[in-house]
UniProtKB/Swiss-Prot annotation:
Domain remarks: The cysteine framework is XIV (C-C-C-C).
Protein name per its UniProtKB record: Conotoxin flf14b
Keyword Secreted: yes
Keyword Disulfide bond belongs to the record: yes
Disulfide bridge map: C6-C26, C10-C22
Family stated for the protein in its record: Belongs to the conotoxin R superfamily.
Keywords (A to Z) from UniProt: Disulfide bond, Secreted, Toxin
Tissue expression: Expressed by the venom duct.
Localization of this protein: Secreted
GO cellular component: a single term: extracellular region
Length: 27
């Protein structure tokens, strides 16, 4: 799926996850 969508769901779905962590996981 789209990386931005992945980051969005990561940020709202996992407490304490930073944008950088989500971006790393999603790319």
């Amino acid at each position: 799926w789209d990386v931005n969508d992945c980051i969005h769901f990561c940020l709202i779905g996992v407490v304490g996850r930073s944008y950088t962590e989500c971006h790393t996981m999603c790319t």
